[in-house]
């Protein structure tokens, strides 16, 4: 009798648990009311392409003007984090539909000082089944053709910190919580894959917030910023300060000659001639 009763109670508990698990997931639109410390969600919209949905394409350095299209349904969440007085870290989190999700998260960075969401990378990642997110690193550049990005944010300490490391961390923390609310379970593995300043962001994540990711790819990291910027400015002023009239101006037509000379001098240093310089020292 006791055995039958225990089996009955176990079955009842199991049936009661089913709706609890089901309701742990949230609809895309309900994520707009999700509460996360110092985070405001401004949009949560289900995107159902038919056949394709075209994403925004900021006019910024390093950005292609080719249209960005997505062909799989997903939940698009936008918001911002304000962890400090002058912080406003804009971000977007894209979540593939549950039956297309690979249970992984892929964070992505941005090049240089660019203050834009990396929509092209978001589109690429969502097609592969990743929950994915990108931030503007705490500032927004102009979106006017022919105009250079603004730099006023560089005089605001909070925004410099956001660009330097806090923006990516805040975005990752928010993305994890948004993802968990949407799918009703935590991310199995979290990765970072980005290059240039995104590679530098990878290194700062690894150094300051090692708990954010299970694996990190830091492509051509633009680190050692003080030296990097000093050399960049010197080379720019020396080579193109006065355009073609600069004493050190090097015309584009001679680039292939320089490229060949560098390969001839350095390619074999790593033991293999393959047109790739693995050891520039």
Predicted regions and their residues:
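Bacterial N-terminal signal peptides
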Residues: 8-19
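Catalytic-loop region of hydrolases
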Residues: 23-104, 117-120, 259, 277
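Cap/lid segment of the alpha/beta-hydrolase catalytic domain
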Residues: 102, 107, 111-187, 230-231
């Amino acid at each position: 009798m006791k055995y039958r009763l225990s089996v009955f109670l176990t079955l009842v508990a199991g049936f009661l648990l089913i709706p609890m698990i089901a309701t742990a997931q949230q609809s895309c639109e309900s994520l707009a009311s999700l509460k996360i410390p110092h985070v405001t969600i401004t949009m949560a919209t289900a995107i159902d392409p038919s056949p394709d949905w075209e994403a925004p394409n900021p006019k910024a350095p390093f950005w292609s003007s080719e249209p960005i299209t997505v062909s799989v349904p997903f939940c698009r969440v936008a918001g911002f984090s304000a962890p400090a007085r002058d912080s406003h870290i804009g971000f977007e989190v894209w979540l593939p539909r549950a039956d297309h999700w690979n249970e992984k998260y892929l964070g992505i960075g941005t090049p240089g000082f660019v203050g834009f969401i990396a929509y092209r990378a978001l589109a690429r990642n969502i097609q592969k089944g990743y929950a994915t997110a990108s931030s503007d690193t705490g500032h927004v550049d102009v979106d006017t053709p022919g105009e250079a990005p603004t730099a006023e944010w560089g005089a605001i300490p909070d925004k410099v910190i956001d660009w330097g490391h806090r923006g990516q961390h805040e975005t990752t923390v928010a993305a994890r919580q948004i993802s968990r609310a949407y799918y009703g379970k935590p991310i199995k593995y979290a990765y970072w894959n980005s290059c240039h300043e995104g590679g530098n962001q990878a290194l700062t994540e690894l150094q300051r917030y090692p708990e954010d990711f299970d694996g990190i790819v830091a492509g051509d990291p633009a680190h050692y910023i003080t030296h990097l910027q000093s050399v960049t400015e010197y080379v720019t002023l020396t080579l193109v300060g006065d355009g073609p009239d600069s004493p050190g101006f090097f015309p584009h037509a001679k680039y292939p000659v320089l490229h060949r000379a560098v390969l001839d001098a350095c390619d074999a240093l790593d033991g293999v001639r393959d047109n790739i310089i693995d050891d520039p020292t």
